[in-house]
Regions:
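S-adenosyl-L-methionine-dependent methyltransferase catalytic core, i.e., the SAM/SAH-binding region
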Residues: 1-148
Length: 148
């Protein structure tokens, strides 16, 4: 059973997003695909939980989690997932954050479902992280089985 640390009432929503993403203190998290449209509250909540800044695309560190902000016009998802997977620890996960249905840049869930196995990843869950963004969890099949 997980132990959840209580937060002040005003912080509960934003800190909860990091918990829903499975992000814990001292994890190393890399952010890819940042642009002006990302949800800064989601970013701030994750940074607060991990106790450091998110690593950018130029980092060479091994990471526990990759946050990939992805929009329909961003190019080839398979190529980007190959790049995102490179620094990932063996049991690491990639969260593909996409604009929700009806929002500019919305990505069809089938696009993610088709791209994931091409690069050796399994889609394991989907969650809402904010009013405008949804997240899809991708992991290696070995990591996916251990989290079920």
């Amino acid at each position: 059973m997980k132990t959840v640390v209580a937060a002040a009432a005003g912080d509960a929503g934003k800190l909860g997003v990091a918990e829903r993403l499975g992000i814990q203190s001292d994890m190393v998290v890399q952010e890819l695909g940042w642009d002006n449209d990302v949800d800064d509250d989601v970013r701030a909540a994750i940074e607060e939980v991990i106790g450091s800044d998110l690593l950018d695309e130029d980092s060479d560190d091994i990471v526990d989690v990759v946050l990939l902000w992805w929009r329909d016009q961003d190019g080839d998802l398979v190529d980007t997932l190959v790049d995102a997977r490179a620094p990932l620890a063996d049991n690491g996960v990639i969260w593909v954050l996409t604009p929700k249905t009806g929002r500019d840049g919305h990505v069809e869930p089938s696009d993610i479902a088709e791209a994931a196995p091409t690069v050796g990843l399994a889609q394991t869950s989907n969650i809402s992280v904010s009013d405008d963004w949804a997240a899809t969890r991708l992991a290696s099949p070995k990591a996916a089985k251990s989290k079920r």
